[in-house]
């Protein structure tokens, strides 16, 4: 029997993808032996896939104001924000509302 896996989908929209190598969708397979919360996921993203200007995405241990986070099309504020525990096949969407002009 293999190591348990947690498969999720990350999506980036409205400019957020520019901070992640211009990739709008990523399918991730995470270590299923670990409890994965949004807080843990953000740390993993910072260490592994955030390629440009982290200060535009993260502020301390959370996303910056102006970055909307939807988990399975539901605002993360309704689901516990950083404490939300990721489930198999979750879709986590990051939308930037920060636009130059």
UniProtKB/Swiss-Prot annotation:
Coiled coil segments of this chain: none
Pathway(s) served: tRNA modification; 5-methoxycarbonylmethyl-2-thiouridine-tRNA biosynthesis
Compartmental location: Cytoplasm
Pfam families given in the database record: Urm1
Residue numbers carrying 1-thioglycine: 101
InterPro entries hit by this protein: Beta-grasp_dom_sf (IPR012675), Mopterin_synth/thiamin_S_b (IPR016155), Urm1 (IPR015221)
PTM entry text: C-terminal thiocarboxylation occurs in 2 steps, it is first acyl-adenylated (-COAMP) via the hesA/moeB/thiF part of the MOCS3 homolog, then thiocarboxylated (-COSH) via the rhodanese domain of the MOCS3 homolog.
Gene Ontology annotations for the cellular component aspect, listed alphabetically: cytosol
Cross-link (Glycyl lysine isopeptide (Gly-Lys) (interchain with K-? in acceptor proteins)): 101
Keywords: Cytoplasm, Isopeptide bond, tRNA processing, Ubl conjugation pathway
Gene Ontology biological-process entries: negative regulation of JNK cascade; protein urmylation; tRNA thio-modification; tRNA wobble uridine modification
PANTHER family reported in the protein's UniProt record: RURM1 PROTEIN
Oligomer and partners: Interacts with cer.
Similarity-based family: Belongs to the URM1 family.
Role, per record: Acts as a sulfur carrier required for 2-thiolation of mcm(5)S(2)U at tRNA wobble positions of cytosolic tRNA(Lys), tRNA(Glu) and tRNA(Gln). Serves as sulfur donor in tRNA 2-thiolation reaction by being thiocarboxylated (-COSH) at its C-terminus by MOCS3. The sulfur is then transferred to tRNA to form 2-thiolation of mcm(5)S(2)U. Also acts as a ubiquitin-like protein (UBL) that is covalently conjugated via an isopeptide bond to lysine residues of target proteins such as Prx2/Jafrac1, Ciao1, Eip71CD and GILT1.
The protein, known as: Ubiquitin-related modifier 1 homolog
Organism this protein belongs to: Drosophila sechellia (Fruit fly)
Taxonomy of the source species: Eukaryota, Metazoa, Ecdysozoa, Arthropoda, Hexapoda
